Swiss-Prot record:
Comp. bias regions, Acidic residues: 132-143
Boundaries of every IGFBP N-terminal domain copy: 28-109
Official protein name in the record: Insulin-like growth factor-binding protein 1
Record's subunit section: Binds equally well IGF1 and IGF2. Interacts with integrin ITGA5:ITGB1. Interacts with VHL; this interaction inhibits HIF1A degradation.
Residue(s) carrying Phosphothreonine: T170
Gene, per the UniProt record: Igfbp1
UniProt organism field: Rattus norvegicus (Rat)
Amino acid sequence: MPEFLTVVSWPFLILLSFQVRVVAGAPQPWHCAPCTAERLELCPPVPASCPEISRPAGCGCCPTCALPLGAACGVATARCAQGLSCRALPGEPRPLHALTRGQGACVLEPAAPATSSLSGSQHEEAKAAVASEDELAESPEMTEEQLLDSFHLMAPSREDQPILWNAISTYSSMRAREITDLKKWKEPCQRELYKVLERLAAAQQKAGDEIYKFYLPNCNKNGFYHSKQCETSLDGEAGLCWCVYPWSGKKIPGSLETRGDPNCHQYFNVQN
């Protein structure tokens, strides 16, 4: 497993941020790695036929061609064109989960008027996709996995840099107020989260180099590990992913580390 600073699971951080206000005067948040001239020189050219150039998603530096109406999209894909937003497909049972896997579609933004290029049926589908996401956001029964997906939609970017640092400040505030419910977490991934919070709270007080890569435990709603684990990168390069045993978080022997999908399900297929 890569030796990077480990950070806490995002669902837990999101829950903390809803419970306690962020400490005033918190240290500066971690930033995306700067787009140096050397990095920009490595960017592939945008095709001349591209109708609209879009800024990169997340911490990327290279401009991309904006996605058109109806194109597949997600958290890690290029951005949708102006007037469009990336939404889960109508009827998708796990909208946020689908968006983290690039299984959404570019549709008209809720406030955007329909255009002549969009048929009546397409317009209704676009509205249905928006409605499904709105209903999910209002549901009081959001699971921890959905909260994880929700955070990935707010992954660190040049527009949203304070999320991680503010969450750590929130934890420090809880500690100062002697809120000790954190110690009730018993499952393996949950225990790791608590230890990581302790380390991050301490690291917050120290000055040093910027952190551009870190591993964040990917926990399920029961407090165990998802079989697929990935590092998070703030330098524009895709992080490594690998496969683990859900009950321990230990890497599966012989499994690959890749910047794509390691296909962890292959190690759990039951042979008949």
